[in-house]
Structures are given as structure tokens and as C-alpha cells.
Swiss-Prot record:
Name of the protein in its database record: Protein-glutamate methylesterase/protein-glutamine glutaminase 2
Naturally occurring in which organism (per UniProt): Pseudomonas syringae pv. syringae (strain B728a)
BP-aspect Gene Ontology terms: chemotaxis
Domain named Response regulatory: residues: 2-119
EC category: hydrolase
Location of the CheB-type methylesterase domain: 147-336
A GO CC annotation given for this chain: cytoplasm
Keywords: Chemotaxis, Cytoplasm, Hydrolase, Phosphoprotein
Pfam families in UniProt: CheB_methylest, Response_reg
Location relative to the cell: Cytoplasm
SUPFAM superfamilies documented for this protein: CheY-like (SSF52172), Methylesterase CheB, C-terminal domain (SSF52738)
PTM entry text: Phosphorylated by CheA. Phosphorylation of the N-terminal regulatory domain activates the methylesterase activity.
InterPro entries: CheB-like, CheB_C, CheY-like_superfamily, Sig_transdc_resp-reg_Me-estase, Sig_transdc_resp-reg_receiver
Coarse class of the protein's main subcellular location: cytoplasm
Amino acid sequence: MKIAIVNDMPMAIEALRRALAFEPAHQIIWVASNGADAVQRCVEQTPDLILMDLIMPVMDGVEATRRIMAETPCAIVIVTVDHEQNMRRVFEAMGHGALDVVDTPAIGGPNPKEAAAPLLRKILNIDWLIGQRVGLERVAATPRAAPSRRDRLVAIGSSAGGPAALEILLKALPVSFPAAIVLVQHVDQVFAAGMADWLSSASGLPVRLAREGETPQPGVVLLAGTNHHIRLLKDGTLAYTAEPVNEVYRPSIDVFFESVTRYWSGEAIGVLLTGMGRDGAQGLKAMRERGFLTIAQDQASSAVYGMPKAAAAIDAAVEIRPLPAIAPRLIEVFTQ
């Protein structure tokens, strides 16, 4: 994989060089010391992946991500030394299309290979996404009971560009929205709590991490919060699970959508937002085949038109809508 580093700190650059050296297939093709330089270098030689710092002179990582995704799109991972202090910037960058976030590896310790492992795992996942090799082993659906108007669920999946898309969608929903909402966003568990807090503040709706064993209810938005998959169980409660182990991204949108298809006994809507790869497409199709309304974000409003495109290609979406039109449609369906 051809990788570029955008960072103004020599120690951080050296840490990334050493971490990448553990995987001979990775080639560093250039290094930029600020976002403006990176934007220009991408025009000259677009990499497969950029490891992007947040705080830099001239142009920061948020603006550089926005410019690169608009002009010469490629995979971007935010690499930061202090994600807690920079949480808002992290999700702004992800809103512009950054795929993931990872701490700068601390390679000066006794086990540098272990320190490099989180970064290398994320790069491996992104390599799979770029190749669109993500798949799902389909499972037979359990016939659902007749819908109850009291049991309503919106299942939403998103990846690259998702934080900003989720902010827009949730902000357009009333606090009195009468359906439970569960979000599955591709984000590491280290950043999940911060994302929930950020979404809650930005949208005006209460957003928190989903807890093992709880039942989705109207009035609170639940975000999958670990590096395990989240599933709906037969009794209507949520559970985290390591299976299936072959899913590239954890939590998997497909896994959650499939569980809704099998076990949700009321009304449900599946929504697939911006993101790279195919995760969510097969699960959305399963929801459609069980009679649920399914919505995919359109190309024009998607930061990365990968997952919704995959859904459209297999006829998984009943409706394809621009992002600003999705919340009004949810309100229309569930307030009739």
C-alpha cells in the first residue's frame, strides 16, 4: 500500500515510519509537514492512504481532509497524540470523510511491534475496504410477528463522513420522535464515548453508548460502543458479540441490520449513510426483503459514496434520498 504521512512533528513522523516498517508491503511515498502541502502533494501523487495529523501550521488536518476528499479523494486515517483534547476536531475530520482515528504509536517502549499493532490493524482493514472485499454470510430470517405501533426502530449505519451526516440527520428530528434509534458507526471504542457526547451536544438529542442487555426505546439515541458487533436478540435486547470474526469492521452494520431482520417484531426503518466499502448493503437488502422500509443516502450528499452505492447496486434501498430529506421522511412515516 502506498502511504503518505502528514505531520509537522519529527518524532511523530519517525514513530510512524518505524511502525510501518513492520509491514514490508507498506511504502511511504511522501511526507508533508502541513495540510496545504499535503493537498498539493495529493494532486501530484495521490496515495492509497494518508496518515493525517490534526494540529499543524498553515492548514490543519480537518481542512486538509476536506480539501483532499473534495479534490483528490483517498483513504485518510487521523493519527493524533491526544484524542481527548482534540475530540471535536476528530469528528469534524471524520465528517469530511476520514475513515478512522488512531493514537500515534509509542514505539520507544519495550515492545515496539505491539505498540504499532493498532495502527497496522486499521491499515489492514482499510486495505480490505479499498479492495471492496467485505462480505457477509447471509443467515435465514426468522418470520416476524405482526407489527406493533408501539415498537418502532430506526437502524442507522454509517462510516466515512458519518459523524457529520449523523449530526445533520439527528438535528432534524424532534426530541419527541416516537421511535427508538440505534446507530452503528465505524469508530474505534476508544473514541465512541466522545462521539456520543459530541453528537448529543451537536444534535440536541440525548445520545449515549448502547449498554449490554438494554432494550432500544424512544427518547434516547444508542450508539454501538465497543469493538465487538452489536446485535438485537430474540427478546428485543441488545448484546455485544465477537462473532462473526471474519467481519473487517467492528462493529459491523451488516451484522446489526441482519439481527433486526430476524428479531425486531415491530415497525423498522433501515438507513445506510455515507461510507467506504460495502458494509450495510447486504443487511439493508435483508431488511427490505422482510418488508421494512430501507433508505440509502444519495451520491450527491455523501462524503464517500461507497456503502450507499453498494446498496443501490443490489436494489437494497426502497428509497434513495439526499441527506437533508431523510429525517423528514422518518418523521412522516413514524408520526402518521
